[in-house]
Amino acid sequence: MNFNNRQDLINDIREWASNDETSYRNWIRPTIIFSAGSDLSYFDCISEWQKTIPVIAARYFSCMGLPMSINQVELVLTDEDVEDLANGLYDDYEEEFEETRARYHPDRYPDDAERFGIGTGE
């Protein structure tokens, strides 16, 4: 964990979050389900991701032996850091988001529904 190199810290949190089952189950998957089910625009999706970043980062720091509250995380991470993490995690889970969105709204996203075999009996 390197607080001096912001990009390394962001990359570490992103990689860790992508591999942490608890973060996925408690924050990442619910964010995907909410965003896809609500059929949010890209910018609204990023806004939802930004809301989860402080919680995920607090868990990251705690697992790294540096327990922090969400308020403390917000002092460590800049708005730009949170935005970078939100964009990165969205990118990591974009395909899962598209599949979930197609399951909720196959009529609005027929190409995605077909791509994921939704409603085709496959």
Question: Predicted segment positions?
Answer:
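Acidic interaction surfaces
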Residues: 1-122
